[in-house]
């Protein structure tokens, strides 16, 4: 109270809260937090005992009564606040909505959500005018665009293009056709995905396939700016399958809760099942020439997948996790990430989760040629995660290569190093999937010690 300078405690202690902001009239508080916030009134994760705390929910607290309403409990997208507009009284949310990022408007009077019909699939910035609820500005992109700016009339629901600075460049680039491809898992769950075809696609030909996934708690967002962008690989004459397996936010709490205390178990099965069904549905794919790729948790998935199947002809893992225990204990983020991904589990009370789910403890099952890449100063996933699996596979006489990126952290940011890193991945797949070892041999001539 700015008049009396007295403080009033609204919430005594709740470790699951994220952010809070006042309503325009100052009578309510909009709070974001995990489904477990406020005693779990926002939980809606089915039979799973623990919700995924990365699946951010929204709550409204009445400051007079201290009563809290979980407004997103039955709303599948994951939310973060944009603005509680003081003119129209609506709350605008930036959401992770499957593999898209949409803007939704929540109407407190009706309790309903409405997705704004904006022009792009992935909205990276959205701002409402302070004094005019009709005017907004936003920037977005998708599978064929990036950094496109618009104004938006919230009354007419019409966007007006302001700027598209990348268009002159993208107009010179032939992109492959992309479309959704989903399948039904053995338990009846629909698993979403995308297919990307080579720009010069010929349905009468047979193409090698690259399967990309993250597999962790966030989906693979649509776009063309990621270093793992499907279009990059399609441009090298691969068909690309991007899969969104169980555990990701943006598909509802039951789906995201599958990530907790799983460490790849269900996810690996879905990737294998989805890849088999993808090949069966697309006769132009050579099912003997399948590669797989992932980074960070996706790198963990790449390593772990090879202990489950020999269906891949080549695999690449950047900054992957080979031992859940050492990742939990050594990295800057491992213990905090596991507080959600392995909630209430530790090496001493759930040793199977921390050992049997790591590729290191199953290294003898790996037969797929595996490329490991890692920054030497990675503070998220320490480089030892790749070193120890490389050592194990070399001892076992398995086909493995290990590339270290000097001075780089979890992401390779130095341009020259990034270029070599990218080319190394491409050369690795060309070697094993396209019978073209020359590029790899040129980059890394065979050594005779």
Predicted regions and their residues:
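Non-catalytic accessory segments flanking enzyme active sites
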Residues: 19, 94, 101, 113-202, ...
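Active-site-proximal cap/loop segments of hydrolase catalytic domains
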Residues: 226, 235, 242-449
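A flexible loop/linker signature enriched in serine peptidases of the S9 family
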Residues: 11-18, 31-59, 70-79, 93-104, ...
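Short loop/turn segments that connect beta-strands within beta-propeller blades
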Residues: 2-5, 62-66, 107-111, 153-157
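Residue-level recognition of a conserved intra-blade site in WD40 beta-propeller repeats
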Residues: 22, 84-86, 128
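Hydrophobic beta-strand positions that form the internal "hydrophobic ladder"
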Residues: 26-29, 90-91, 133-136
